[in-house]
Amino acid sequence: MPIDTVMETLPGYAKDIKLNYSTLVRQNTELTPQQLWGTVVASAIATRNDTLTAAALEDGAQHLSEQALEAARIAAALMSMNNIFYRFQHLSSNEKYATMPARLRMNGMRTHGVEPVDFELWSLAVSAINGCGKCVDSHEKVLREKGAGEDLVLAAVRVASVIHAIGAVLDAEKVHQPEAAMA
């Protein structure tokens, strides 16, 4: 089921979310199609909502190459690990943790096969969803060093915020209407 169909199932209280999604997708001027749909896919995966993730992957396959779709998945997977690890370092009052090696494999960050700016945008979007300030700062810095402007960065975060909200509404509706969730 495409995301547009999922959007039709959102209740009235999510009207702003629906309108924001429509505007972001149909009137996007800042992001390339690959940047937009990679951000949608990576962000949907980060919400952990099955319905939204399946819809985003379906739509993503229409707009992204297989390699870009896989790279968006890589960004979501690696950030789900890194965001926890580096958020812990950031939040812990024990400064020693920040000096210790991560010892976590992250080869996908180098071997994803898409434009580095695109992959960084997707990583930034997932990091914003997962609330890792250290990761947000790191990815934003790399993006700026690669020539990305604040408008591009904020456009990706805007997409992430709306996708996250869609996932939250879908989860709330599962709880509100358990019989629908079982179908």
Swiss-Prot record:
Signal sequence, start to end: none
EC number: 1.11.1.28
InterPro entries, per the entry: AhpD, AhpD-like, AhpD_core, CMD-like
Disulfide partners: C132-C135
Active site: C132 (proton donor), C135 (cysteine sulfenic acid (-soh) intermediate)
Pfam families: CMD (PF02627)
Reactions catalysed, as given in the entry: N(6)-[(R)-dihydrolipoyl]-L-lysyl-[lipoyl-carrier protein] + a hydroperoxide = N(6)-[(R)-lipoyl]-L-lysyl-[lipoyl-carrier protein] + an alcohol + H2O
PANTHER family attached to this UniProt entry: ALKYL HYDROPEROXIDE REDUCTASE AHPD (PTHR33930:SF7)
Role: Antioxidant protein with alkyl hydroperoxidase activity. Required for the reduction of the AhpC active site cysteine residues and for the regeneration of the AhpC enzyme activity.
Protein family (similarity comment): Belongs to the AhpD family.
HAMAP family associated with the record: AhpD
Protein name, per record: Alkyl hydroperoxide reductase AhpD
Lineage start: Bacteria, Pseudomonadati, Acidobacteriota, Terriglobia, Terriglobales
